[in-house]
Amino acid sequence: MSNLIEIKSKSTHTATVIFLHGLMDTGKGWETRMENIISMGGLDHIKFVLPTAPTIPISINFGNKGTAWCNVTAFYPGSEEDLIGLEKSMKLVEALIEEEIKNGIPAERIILSGFSQGGALTLYTGYQSKHKLAALITLSGFSPSLSLPSKIKPENKDIPLTMFHGTDDKVVNCKWGELSHKSYLKVGIKNSQFISITNLDHSSNEFELKQVHDLIEKYLPK
């Protein structure tokens, strides 16, 4: 995959975090924030992989091209879904997971995470993957498809899930994130939590990044 950012582990590599950016962004755009998380300590054994989405026409951007994991017509529940684009991007992420496994990192030592549309792809891939991952973490994420809950593989239902969302998010409303989480609870995703962050808009902050750090340290211990 082109434009792939890798932050190498500082000690022996025994675990990996794959982080997926949001619409019109790049893996490079999240590099500094991932380095901030690493600087909080305890993650020297972990490699961070930050891919960049393909460049495609985006309906919400008046058809102009930009980086996106799939086409977007609107950011609200029930908007038109680009399932073909989601499936293509899921294959890209699965290839990254399989590359880590090929290099000696078992699936249960890999966390998949993402922001906004990257969070949506995290859910879409993580719950349908043939590889049972260590955990899924989303920031300002949402369910990318109304049909996803019915597609979840039974063996993946106990993958730990944490969804963070800012209460002041004007792009992906916090209520959408909360409804997405509830839709997973209804199909048996019990090991999960939804955490709203007061006064946070469609972005991340130090408090949220510290929570992400603590989860990575929990699910990918040395």
From Swiss-Prot:
Annotated localization: Cytoplasm; Nucleus
Q: Which keywords fit this entry according to its UniProt record?
A: Cytoplasm, Fatty acid metabolism, Hydrolase, Lipid metabolism, Nucleus, Serine esterase
Per the record, the major location class is cytoplasm
Gene Ontology biological process terms in this record = fatty acid metabolic process
Q: Name one Pfam family in it.
A: Abhydrolase_2
Which residues does UniProt mark as catalytic? 116 (charge relay system), 169 (charge relay system), 202 (charge relay system)
- Reaction equations catalysed: S-hexadecanoyl-L-cysteinyl-[protein] + H2O = L-cysteinyl-[protein] + hexadecanoate + H(+)
Q: What terms describe the molecular function in GO for this protein?
A: carboxylic ester hydrolase activity; palmitoyl-(protein) hydrolase activity
What EC number(s) does its UniProt record assign? 3.1.2.-, 3.1.2.22
What is a single cellular component term in the Gene Ontology annotation?
cytoplasm
Classify the source by domain of life. Answer: Eukaryota
The role this protein plays is:
Hydrolyzes fatty acids from S-acylated cysteine residues in proteins with a strong preference for palmitoylated G-alpha proteins over other acyl substrates. Mediates the deacylation of G-alpha proteins such as GPA1 in vivo, but has weak or no activity toward palmitoylated Ras proteins. Has weak lysophospholipase activity in vitro; however such activity may not exist in vivo.
Q: Which family does it belong to?
A: Belongs to the AB hydrolase superfamily. AB hydrolase 2 family.
Protein name as annotated: Acyl-protein thioesterase 1 homolog 2
Source lineage: Eukaryota, Amoebozoa, Evosea, Eumycetozoa, Dictyostelia
